[in-house]
Amino acid sequence: MTEIIEAIKESAKRIAKTIQTTDFGYSDSANESGDQQLKLDVQSDLIIEEELSKTSSVRVLASEEKSEPITINERGKYLVGYDPLDGSSLVDVNLSVGSIFGIYENDFHGNSLKAAVYVVYGPRVEMVISTIKAERFILQNGKFLFMEELQLGEKGKLNAPGGTQQYWYPHHKALVEDLFSQGYRLRYSGGMVPDLHQILVKKGGLFSYPGTKDKPRGKLRKVFEVFPFAHVYEKAGGEAINDEGNRLLDLKAEEIHDTTPCFFGSLYEINKVREFYGK
């Protein structure tokens, strides 16, 4: 496990430098989800594959940018699912973006996730590593230095509602409006990593990406995005559930790009989700 996290650290350093120096134009290909791939997406994916391929403990790599997992070492113990540059379209407007990693054993189901890591590329580069607890690090002088253990309060003040509003179901719209009526502040950049990171650092709130009329199974992918952040939020004392009120880490990935509605937050906000969703 340690060598995997060290490889992720090296990947993050290289990606941070790439963001500073690379053309932001689009490549000629699209990823498995149909999104046109930025050159940064492609480069970030190659960097991560290169660094993780140096390890002896990784058996399989699954990238959000590729249609199928690849086996790199038959004797390896772990499977790594990752989104190399989540929110990459925000780079050209100079907003924060991130990388997300899930370290699995045996398969890519939620209960097989052993650790999660994400990186925020913003005014400074930060990393959160979630194993037994969720710990925050900052990149300084080429090294990731420990900052703090992340711990959510029971109730927060931030609301990050994803999905196109015109396609929200009435009960979800009522949930969002209820939180705003309580004085919750809107914090939504369109980047999953910085939005979820802000809620963690500010010690509470709700990030939601529901099932909608146009995307009833949600948009966010279990293996690459949802399961890793569910792990982080649980280790930080919060909860992460789907629209049925089920724990996200109890879900299975029916295929590598499987999606799900998802809600991440502190205890109060998740109970509000259950209330408005009748769960």
From Swiss-Prot:
GO cellular component assignments: cytosol
Residues that, per the record, bind Mg(2+) 1: E64, D83, L85
Record's subcellular location: Cytoplasm
Matches recorded under InterPro entries: FBPase_C_dom (IPR044015), FBPase_class-1 (IPR000146), FBPase_N (IPR033391), FBPtase (IPR028343), SBPase (IPR023079)
GO biological process, one term: fructose metabolic process
Catalysed reactions, as listed in the record: beta-D-fructose 1,6-bisphosphate + H2O = beta-D-fructose 6-phosphate + phosphate
Pathway assignment: Carbohydrate biosynthesis; gluconeogenesis
Gene3D superfamilies (alphabetical): 3.40.190.80, Fructose-1,6-Bisphosphatase, subunit A, domain 1 (3.30.540.10)
Enzyme class: hydrolase
Residues reported to bind Mg(2+) 2: D83, D86, E225
UniProt entry keywords in alphabetical sequence: Carbohydrate metabolism, Cytoplasm, Hydrolase, Magnesium, Metal-binding
Binding site for substrate: D86, G87, S88, S89, Y188, K219
Pfam families: FBPase, FBPase_C
Top-level lineage group: Bacteria
Cofactor: Mg(2+)
Molecular function (Gene Ontology), one example: fructose 1,6-bisphosphate 1-phosphatase activity
Record-listed E.C. numbers: 3.1.3.11
CC cofactor note: Binds 2 magnesium ions per subunit.
Family: Belongs to the FBPase class 1 family.
Stored HAMAP family: FBPase_class1
Assembly with partners or alone: Homotetramer.
Name under which the protein is recorded: Fructose-1,6-bisphosphatase class 1
Native source species: Nitratiruptor sp. (strain SB155-2)
